[in-house]
């Protein structure tokens, strides 16, 4: 059980690190005259898209979470109006 949790954690961590490193160039070699074969091309990186295209897939999710429900008399707004009055007495 714990072994499978460790394996899934390592897999998820490695996938997230690979995604981050996929969009950034690898450090170039410091040997002069030697070509750098390990430079990752950034033209295929999704993070280089324009701002409107980059977050287009998140737009429906953000719209749902930012939608606020209105209730009458402040019920459900998160503010407990009577608890402060009780504590004051």
UniProtKB/Swiss-Prot annotation:
The keyword Signal applies. Residues 24-69 form a propeptide. It holds the Pfam family Neuropeptide_S. The keyword Signal applies. Keywords: Cleavage on pair of basic residues, Neuropeptide, Secreted, Signal. Residues 1-23 form the signal peptide. One of its GO terms (cellular component) is extracellular region. Its main location: secreted. It is found in: Secreted. GO terms for biological process: neuropeptide signaling pathway; positive regulation of action potential; positive regulation of circadian sleep/wake cycle, wakefulness; positive regulation of synaptic transmission, GABAergic; positive regulation of synaptic transmission, glutamatergic; synaptic transmission, glutamatergic; visual learning. May play an important anorexigenic role. Modulates arousal and anxiety as well as increases locomotor activity. Binds to its receptor NPSR1 with nanomolar affinity to increase intracellular calcium concentrations. This is Neuropeptide S.
């Amino acid at each position: 059980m714990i072994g499978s949790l460790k394996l899934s954690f390592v897999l998820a961590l490695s996938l997230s690190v690979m995604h981050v490193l996929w969009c950034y160039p690898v450090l170039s070699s410091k040997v002069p005259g030697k070509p750098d074969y390990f430079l990752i091309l950034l033209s295929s990186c999704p993070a280089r898209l324009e701002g409107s295209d980059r977050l287009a897939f998140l737009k429906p999710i953000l719209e749902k979470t930012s939608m606020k429900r209105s209730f009458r008399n402040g019920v459900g707004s998160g503010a407990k109006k009577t608890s402060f009055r009780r504590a004051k007495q």
